[in-house]
Amino acid sequence: MTTACPARTSSLMDDLLGLLRIRIKRGVNLAVRDISSSDPYVVVKMGKQKLKTRVINKDVNPEWNEDLTLSVTDSNLTVLLTVYDHDMFSKDDKMGDAEFEIKPYIEALRMQLDGLPSGTIVTTVKPSRRNCLAEESRVTWVDGKLVQDLVLRLRHVECGEVEAQLQWIDLPGSKGL
């Protein structure tokens, strides 16, 4: 005797808008937390998701060029980026953090942009007290894709910035934008 399949419950794909690829490019003038340098890495959190880059040893101007990909179910969520100094024998030291909204980027994605020339600036986000931008952030149409470049000024620390770039990945079968 076979049993009937239970009614399908909602899956992650039903709520998933798509994937947000955050390229952590580099750190600039990060704080010294060891004797003469730091061993920095970045942790990115959005909702319950948490991802991290590799550690770059003895460098306050590290180049990660590392992609961290988050699944997006809510465009109102903010992304928290925290830089840490890796320590071998003690707790890792915090080297500052920055927060940014993905909503302006998502809103630009929802526009019909096909046919725009590569390099077209679609929108800009200005630095303000409500965001951690060190300079104006441009959302640009590049080779058929929308990217947003960010220079984030770290908070709760004496100095340091992190350069990052956002890119969207559509997933077949997801709710989409």
Swiss-Prot record:
Compartments it resides in: Cell membrane; Nucleus; Cytoplasm, Cytosol
Keyword Cytoplasm belongs to the record: yes
Binding site for Ca(2+) 1: R33, D34, D85, D87, D93
Binding residues annotated for Ca(2+) 2, in chain numbering: D34, D39, D85, H86, D87
Origin: domain of life: Eukaryota
Stretches assigned to the C2 domain: 4-118
Knocked-out gene: effects: When associated with disruption in CAR1, CAR5 and CAR9 genes, reduced sensitivity to abscisic acid (ABA) during seedling establishment and root growth regulation.
MF annotations from Gene Ontology: calcium ion binding; GTPase activator activity; lipid binding; phospholipid binding; protein homodimerization activity
SMART domains associated with the record: C2 (SM00239)
Cofactor(s) this protein requires: Ca(2+)
Position of the signal peptide: none
Keywords: Abscisic acid signaling pathway, Calcium, Cell membrane, Cytoplasm, GTPase activation, Lipid-binding, Membrane, Metal-binding, Nucleus, Plant defense
GO CC annotation terms, alphabetical: cytosol; nucleus; plasma membrane
GO terms for biological process, alphabetical: abscisic acid-activated signaling pathway; defense response; positive regulation of abscisic acid-activated signaling pathway; positive regulation of defense response to bacterium; positive regulation of response to salt stress; response to salt stress
Subunit structure: Dimers and oligomers. Binds to PYR/PYL/RCAR abscisic acid intracellular receptors in an ABA-independent manner, both at the plasma membrane and in the nucleus. Interacts directly with PYR1, PYL1, PYL4, PYL6 and PYL8. Binds phospholipids in a Ca(2+)-dependent manner. Interacts with YchF1.
Functional note: Mediates the transient calcium-dependent interaction of PYR/PYL/RCAR abscisic acid (ABA) receptors with the plasma membrane and thus regulates ABA sensitivity. Stimulates the GTPase/ATPase activities of YchF1, and regulates its subcellular localization. Promotes tolerance towards salinity stress by limiting the accumulation of reactive oxygen species (ROS). Promotes resistance to bacterial pathogens (e.g. Xanthomonas oryzae pv. oryzae and P.syringae pv. tomato DC3000).
Name the UniProt record assigns to this protein: Protein C2-DOMAIN ABA-RELATED 4
Lineage: Eukaryota, Viridiplantae, Streptophyta, Embryophyta, Tracheophyta
